[in-house]
């Protein structure tokens, strides 16, 4: 029996094909030769497997966490694309050839599919396209741009996630104080409000879902302390320093969330 998917409980990620695969060659065809030649190119190369993109190792390691439960699907990844279904076929064939457990995709020719993030309860959207990321953020969704060149996927299973704090896990209200009142005013404000939690930011839901998976890992580790090694590690890396660090720690705890490590580097 297939594991059940509960969108309210699962960690659901939207990923653009530009983040998952290296599309530089086909994108160049689109830009330089136009849409019709691009469509022909994709048909001609339908069975040519796309090379992994920047987000590929991250997505693979997330999906691998589904082996922690036979009853429910812990992680679901959905491809969100401005391609039409025909040109998107190459993406889905490459997904299958790489052995990625991704079966859901939304292809909308030339249009942004972000409005489906909320009904699908997506905690994050990843893309290599800066404009797409900004558009998703402007619509109120958590989104991130993947940058650089893809690195070889070494097949490791460890998943290490680092979050900034202000404007990411938390809202940006403290950052606004810093901008308006300077460092001294900011430190004074954060010291006075050390026990008052900040409001949750755009990535807090993602951390909550990751924490749930970590809880399952903790149970596995307790049941098999010598045989199971935890894979997921979470850190906060922030420009905050003492005394402002206390409000960050207290906020995370009062939200009912946790991190393994914290780096206060202001």
What role is predicted for each listed range?
Residues 158:
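Phosphate-coordination loops involved in phosphoryl transfer and adenosine-cofactor binding
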Residues 128, 265-266:
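Glycine-rich beta-to-alpha transition loops that act as phosphate-gripper elements at the mouths
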Residues 20-23, 94-98, 113-152, 169, ...:
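Hydrophobic, ordered structural segments
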Residues 2-111, 155, 165-264:
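Alpha-helical substrate-recognition element adjacent to the catalytic core
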């Amino acid at each position: 029996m297939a594991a059940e998917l509960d969108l309210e409980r699962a960690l659901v990620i939207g990923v653009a094909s530009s983040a998952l695969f290296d599309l530089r060659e086909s994108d160049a065809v689109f830009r330089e030769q136009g849409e019709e030649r691009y469509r022909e190119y994709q048909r001609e190369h339908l069975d040519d497997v796309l090379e992994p993109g920047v987000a590929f190792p991250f997505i693979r390691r997330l999906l691998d966490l589904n082996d922690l439960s036979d009853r429910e699907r812990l992680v679901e990844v959905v491809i969100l694309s401005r391609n039409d279904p025909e040109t998107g076929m190459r993406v889905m064939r490459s997904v299958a050839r790489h052995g990625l457990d991704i079966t859901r995709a939304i292809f909308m020719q030339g249009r942004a599919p972000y409005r489906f993030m909320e009904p699908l309860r997506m905690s994050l959207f990843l893309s290599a396209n800066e404009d797409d990321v900004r558009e998703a953020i402007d619509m109120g969704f958590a989104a991130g741009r993947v940058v650089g060149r893809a690195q070889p996927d070494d097949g490791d299973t460890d998943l290490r996630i680092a979050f900034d704090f202000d404007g990411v896990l938390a809202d940006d209200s403290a950052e606004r104080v810093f901008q308006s009142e300077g460092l001294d005013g900011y430190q004074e404000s954060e010291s006075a409000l050390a026990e008052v939690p900040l409001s949750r930011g755009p990535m807090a839901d993602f951390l909550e879902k990751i924490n749930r998976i970590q809880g399952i890992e903790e149970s596995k580790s307790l049941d098999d302390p010598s045989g199971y090694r935890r894979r997921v590690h979470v850190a906060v890396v922030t420009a905050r320093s003492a005394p402002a660090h206390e409000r960050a720690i207290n906020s995370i705890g009062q939200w009912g969330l946790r991190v393994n490590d914290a780096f206060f580097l202001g």
